[in-house]
Amino acid sequence: MFLEIPRWLLALIILYLSIPLVVYYVIPYLFYGNKSTKKRIIIFVLGDVGHSPRICYHAISFSKLGWQVELCGYVEDTLPKIISSDPNITVHHMSNLKRKGGGTSVIFMVKKVLFQVLSIFKLLWELRGSDYILVQNPPSIPILPIAVLYKLTGCKLIIDWHNLAYSILQLKFKGNFYHPLVLISYMVEMIFSKFADYNLTVTEAMRKYLIQSFHLNPKRCAVLYDRPASQFQPLAGDISRQKALTTKAFIKNYIRDDFDTEKGDKIIVTSTSFTPDEDIGILLGALKIYENSYVKFDSSLPKILCFITGKGPLKEKYMKQVEEYDWKRCQIEFVWLSAEDYPKLLQLCDYGVSLHTSSSGLDLPMKILDMFGSGLPVIAMNYPVLDELVQHNVNGLKFVDRRELHESLIFAMKDADLYQKLKKNVTQEAENRWQSNWERTMRDLKLIH
């Protein structure tokens, strides 16, 4: 009997009978996966999770609202305990392709992007069914196009703009905007950002740029200023700084016998990724001029202990420069600290130094907010958008070259009244913390209620 039925009719019957199977099982499996009863967000950073503080703050803030957070990125160091111990946050470790000599940098970049594409697709397939995906930009390639494609599952896209990826690449190619790789990066950011449901920026200047240059919807763009998280606090008044310096395991080995903060010796700190947009040479040059001032003009200048935290491609170069110089009044230490010890170090310092200049001229260094939260006035390299954060002689000092930095260091080291004024203003500034600022911005975007 079945043999007499036309093939087209048999196919139609099979198709008709398979509709419930497709609708109730296949489509939910493909697009929703293990859909959670909680609101669920994927947070993606193509960087080290433990040293991506703003991304970690996002994860913690969503978790506090009861959301299920899927935090994706490289885990190259110990995760902050507040992340690893949070039952609402699941960390997904991505493998990172490391360069092992041989081959040109362009070939390696292509291999790395292809490796990232496969890794991201695999991970997003496992996490399908999420309500939102938040990606950090930069980098934009390959995560931004993939995140836009992921919207087909019904997921809404949030881009957290830390900077412009093409501007960082442009810096690498000596400012050449028309280099093919720079143009590709620019087009990827401009085109795919239009598909975002929400855009968060770190400055008002960046928000205006995205609206005017990328023609993004103003209603979908909001400024979420970096603010210090709760772990960044000034040193409690009942704790002796000198005692802490000589007893805390993470720092005591750097404190020489003749160094005494109670006798006026000072500690400064800078955090850096040792990239071209942060010239550590300016700080080293200023400290050399300080040394010269001590020898030739003012023997009353206090000792300076300078901590340089972080790691990156130019670190070895600067370490060698420090080793080759005969320091008499300054001691410079390169350190790499855990997420728990870094706030403790800031508590013990007098001033923070920021050498960030911004490849785009539109972002702000988060390290300054960490320093403010710890009660540190900041001596910062000046560029136009910095006015959104640092006001000269109010909550910090500004400079444009090593000589101005040297002059700022002299004022900072010797003028106790200036220090007290700056510290008071910084303490007031730091009262506005991340969580309250985050919730206010998210409500304005109607992301939360």
UniProtKB/Swiss-Prot annotation:
Residues 105-125 dip into the membrane without crossing it. Residues 1-7 are lumenal. It is a single-pass membrane protein. A motif (Dolichol recognition) lies at residues 21-32. It holds the Pfam family Glycos_transf_1. Residues 435-449 are annotated as: Required for oligomerization. Keywords: Endoplasmic reticulum, Glycosyltransferase, Membrane, Signal-anchor, Transferase, Transmembrane, Transmembrane helix. Changing H356Q: Abolishes enzymatic activity. Its main location: endoplasmic reticulum. GO terms for cellular component: cytoplasmic side of endoplasmic reticulum membrane; endoplasmic reticulum. Coiled coil: none annotated. It is found in: Endoplasmic reticulum membrane. One of its GO terms (molecular function) is beta-1,4-mannosyltransferase activity. It catalyses: an N,N'-diacetylchitobiosyl-diphospho-di-trans,poly-cis-dolichol + GDP-alpha-D-mannose = a beta-D-Man-(1->4)-beta-D-GlcNAc-(1->4)-alpha-D-GlcNAc-diphospho-di-trans,poly-cis-dolichol + GDP + H(+). SUPFAM superfamilies: UDP-Glycosyltransferase/glycogen phosphorylase. Present with 1890 molecules/cell in log phase SD medium. Participates in the formation of the lipid-linked precursor oligosaccharide for N-glycosylation. Involved in assembling the dolichol-pyrophosphate-GlcNAc(2)-Man(5) intermediate on the cytoplasmic surface of the ER. Belongs to the glycosyltransferase group 1 family. Glycosyltransferase 33 subfamily. This is Chitobiosyldiphosphodolichol beta-mannosyltransferase. It comes from Saccharomyces cerevisiae (strain ATCC 204508 / S288c). The gene is ALG1.
